[in-house]
Curated annotation (Swiss-Prot):
UniProt site positions, description: Transition state stabilizer: 36, 135
Cofactors required: a divalent metal cation
Name of the protein in question: 2-C-methyl-D-erythritol 2,4-cyclodiphosphate synthase
Function statement: Involved in the biosynthesis of isopentenyl diphosphate (IPP) and dimethylallyl diphosphate (DMAPP), two major building blocks of isoprenoid compounds. Catalyzes the conversion of 4-diphosphocytidyl-2-C-methyl-D-erythritol 2-phosphate (CDP-ME2P) to 2-C-methyl-D-erythritol 2,4-cyclodiphosphate (ME-CPP) with a corresponding release of cytidine 5-monophosphate (CMP).
A molecular-function term among this protein's GO annotations: 2-C-methyl-D-erythritol 2,4-cyclodiphosphate synthase activity
Pfam family, one: YgbB
EC number: 4.6.1.12
Gene, per the UniProt record: ispF
Annotated residues for binding of a divalent metal cation: 10, 12, 44
Species per Swiss-Prot/TrEMBL record: Chromohalobacter salexigens (strain ATCC BAA-138 / DSM 3043 / CIP 106854 / NCIMB 13768 / 1H11)
Length: 162
């Protein structure tokens, strides 16, 4: 077995609500996400990166938005489930790097809590989890404050068991 790299991307538009779930953290905001689950773009991007690194498809295959069982699902539960699939495939997360792209709300004060949630769910030290945020300089849908996007890259290492 060799090292594996995975990349994930997710986006959700804003809709009715009073908070956003990002990185497992509840962030007060004037809107919520339009989504089948809790809409956590960051955790969804991480799930896709993990699944991609193991050639296990994508989040839509494992948690389809046509399945009522996942309606309103806590994305931390999804991430923990994906982590079990990664481990069953004989891999462990070496590290991950993720970016949240949003004009608003500001993410900086929430990043330490996001890192802690992700590290806990993936059984990692927080030093192996990096989360950063950027704007799109008022360009595109994120710049117009119509939604938020996130990207994630993960490095997996073999555990020696399959």
């Amino acid at each position: 077995m060799t090292l594996r790299i995975g990349h994930g991307f997710d986006v959700h538009r804003f809709g009715d609500g009073d908070h956003l779930m990002i990185g497992g953290v509840r962030i007060p905001y004037v809107q919520g996400f339009v989504a089948h689950s809790d809409g956590d773009v960051l955790l969804h991007a991480i799930c896709d990166a993990l699944l991609g690194a193991c050639a296990l498809g994508d989040i839509g295959r494992h948690f389809p938005d046509t399945d009522a069982a996942w309606a309103g699902a806590d994305s931390r539960d999804l991430l923990r489930h994906v982590h079990t699939l990664v481990m069953a495939a004989g891999y462990a997360v070496a590290n991950l790097d993720a970016t949240v792209i949003a004009q608003a709300p500001r993410m900086a004060e929430h990043i330490p809590a996001m890192r802690a949630c992700i590290a806990e769910d993936l059984d990692l030290d927080t030093t192996a989890v990096n989360v950063k945020a950027t704007t799109s300089e008022r360009l595109g849908f994120t710049g117009r404050k119509e939604g938020i996007a996130a990207e994630a890259v993960v490095l997996l290492m073999p555990t020696g068991t399959t």
